[in-house]
Amino acid sequence: MQGIGEVFTRHDDLTALTSGDTPRANNEAMTKIYHLAAENDLPVMLHSNITSKREKNPLYLKEVEEPLRNHPHTRFIWAHAGTSAEIHRHQTQLPFLLPTLTRMLEAYPNLFIDLSWSMLTPYLLDEQGKPRAEWLALVEKYPERFMLGSDVVGRFNKLGQEMHSYKPFLDALPEAVARKVARDNFLAILPRNTEKSAAPR
């Protein structure tokens, strides 16, 4: 085993279809998973929306911050930085996302950001497909904390096309940083002792 996830916690329509308690990253039931991950040096990838379709503030941020704070020895990859296509159908862009991520990356060294799916546009690239300077600056400030992803599900023939979409953004980064974001950061977050993580419990 190389990691846990993508674990769907708060997730647009999937949350609405869930009976009982809303799935949350800070639910007590997740604690054992986070401990297991830390004990076995496994990263945990969480899908946890930062807000709802309508609220113009990071309404659900606490649900991600609590595990980050309470489990400092667990490495968390925040899928799509808490954004989603459904949120963007109602709010084109979240103006609080960049400052929120800036603060969180400084506060939580165990936080890593997945740039897949809803992150490419409208965040990394503008409407003309040009890299946004403020996002380039954030990635350059934390060059080991971002990684690409495809979020391709069931249509793997489109994988190359999806990954190629990031080329304008990667080309605008210093070469060493681009290599980290495109490949090295993901490899670095995987278990350092693969024999231990693969051993049966």
Segments predicted by a language model, with ranges:
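Active-site-adjacent structural elements in enzyme catalytic domains
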Residues: 1-11
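Compositionally biased, intrinsically disordered low-complexity regions
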Residues: 5-7, 84, 151, 193
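Catalytic pocket-lining loop regions of alpha/beta-barrel enzymes
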Residues: 11, 19-147
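Conserved, mostly hydrophobic/aromatic
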Residues: 4, 37, 80, 113, ...
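Glycine/Thr-rich phosphate-binding loops of Rossmann-like dinucleotide-binding domains
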Residues: 14
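Mid-to-C-terminal alpha-helical segments outside catalytic/metal-binding sites
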Residues: 141-147, 152-201
